[in-house]
A protein has these predicted regions:
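N-terminal secretory signal peptides that target proteins for export/translocation
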Residues: 1-4
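Low-complexity, Pro/Thr/Ser/Gly/Ala-rich linker/spacer regions in secreted
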Residues: 24-28, 394-401
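N-terminal carbohydrate-binding accessory modules
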Residues: 25-94, 109-115, 388
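Short, solvent-exposed loop/turn segments at secondary-structure junctions
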Residues: 103-106, 151-155, 262-263, 330-332
């Protein structure tokens, strides 16, 4: 077998990172560029690819909470930094990195008590993210950079808020797109999960999510008050997309639906315009999780027949759909994954990409893929997900349960 040759753009990026070094060996994994053609993702040679992977949680919370100033990853995956080889061993080809806008931008922010805190206490957040993207790239993975936690004004992003904010989120995307536009294997997910509560404008939820609007409260992240009165302007998907494109970035951009990214019913009517035609729709299907999240209604399940039909309509219109989050039950002793065993075969047949939430060693009974730092799959969900990825990597998708 011939030895792999280094990819010129990858080598130049890795060698150019401050404080990051690699041995110059021609054994780098052959990660390719990615772009959108019709309703599929394609690689640098124009071959259709299906993205299958996982999110790694930690970067969105660890630094802003001050858990471990020395390490913004917080060892949430069981080790100080993610073991990219384990993801590849699961036959994954993509990883999603959820970020915190205050930690990336580095401005002092106020918690629910009014006390100021440093969301980048180790002054290492950007360097950590850059190194993580470089390492994942060198391991042969595509990378999604996801704006996960936001907050208006100078409030700390300590919990999910209804939408990106007009001031900080625009600055975030200008900086992030400028930083990573040289990575043709990186995709930008503009905002994790719009839920558009407390609208003060006559706009519909869809208009406010895609074009911006006014919101009258924000989520503090504290037990009391969980939410607080404050009028602020959201950043619409169109404004954030325009900000990314203004940097010269041509990377694919991922656009969520509303209601925690579970509703795609009017996505086609309201999606932002991209002259490059490099956008995809984001859907977060989950099994029933309850009716509230904190004190707010949480409209799940998001995986009913209508949800599949909405996703199919977007595909039929020539636009890709990607599940940047999904999950199933994994409490100890769980056998099988009924939600996943319906969703993933459908996605394979439709050419829809998907990522599991989450590659972390939390001992939660839902939506956790692994038990330990060795990547042992969790009961139920984790076992099924790993087995399914192994099957589709070797066999036609139609042959994989």
């Amino acid at each position: 077998m011939g030895r792999m040759k280094p990819i010129p753009w990858l080598v130049s990026i890795l060698l150019g990172l401050s404080g990051y070094s690699i041995s110059y060996a021609d054994t780098l994994a052959p990660v390719s560029a990615i772009h959108i053609s019709g309703n599929h993702f394609v690689d640098g040679s124009g071959q259709t690819i299906q993205l299958r992977g996982a999110s790694i949680s930690g970067l969105e919370t660890v630094a802003v909470q001050g858990w471990d100033p020395s390490n913004p990853w917080g060892s949430q995956s069981g080790e100080a930094t993610p073991n990219w080889k384990l993801l590849k061993n699961w036959n994954m080809n993509i990883v999603r990195l959820p970020l915190n806008e205050a930690s990336w931008l580095g401005y002092k922010c106020a918690d629910a008590t009014g006390a100021l805190r440093d969301p980048d206490p180790g002054h290492n957040y950007q360097a950590t993210v850059k190194q993580g993207v470089a390492e994942a790239t060198a391991a042969g993975l595509y990378v999604i950079i996801d704006l996960h936690l936001t907050a208006p004004k100078n409030f700390c992003p300590l919990a999910q808020n209804p939408m990106a904010d007009a001031e900080n989120s625009i600055s975030f995307w200008k900086s992030v797109a400028t930083t990573f536009k040289g990575y043709p294997n990186v995709l930008f997910e503009l905002f994790n999960e719009p839920f558009m509560y407390w609208l003060a404008t006559p706009n519909t939820e869809w208009q406010a999510a895609m074009q911006g609007g006014m919101v009258t409260q924000y989520v503090t992240g504290a037990p009391t008050p969980y939410q607080a009165a404050y009028s602020w302007k959201t950043a619409g998907m169109q404004q954030m997309l325009d900000t990314v494109r203004a940097t010269g970035a041509t990377n694919p951009v991922l656009i969520a639906g509303i209601q925690w990214s579970g509703d795609l019913s009017k996505w086609l009517d309201n999606a932002p315009k991209d002259s490059l035609k490099q956008i995809a729709a984001v859907w977060h299907p989950y099994p029933a999780y309850g009716t509230t999240w904190g004190t707010m209604p949480y409209t799940l399940p998001s995986g009913g027949a209508a949800a599949y039909a909405n996703a199919q309509a977007i595909l039929n219109a020539g636009i890709p759909v990607i599940l940047t989050e999904t999950g199933d039950r994994n409490a100890p002793g769980t056998v099988g994954a009924p939600f996943m065993s319906k969703l993933l075969p459908w996605a394979d047949k439709a050419g829809v990409s998907y990522l599991g939430w989450t590659w972390d060693v939390w001992q939660n009974g839902d939506f956790v893929l692994i038990k330990d730092k060795s990547g042992t799959p969790s009961d139920g969900y984790g076992v099924y997900f790993k087995q399914h990825l192994g099957c589709v990597s070797k066999s036609p998708a139609a042959a994989c349960p």
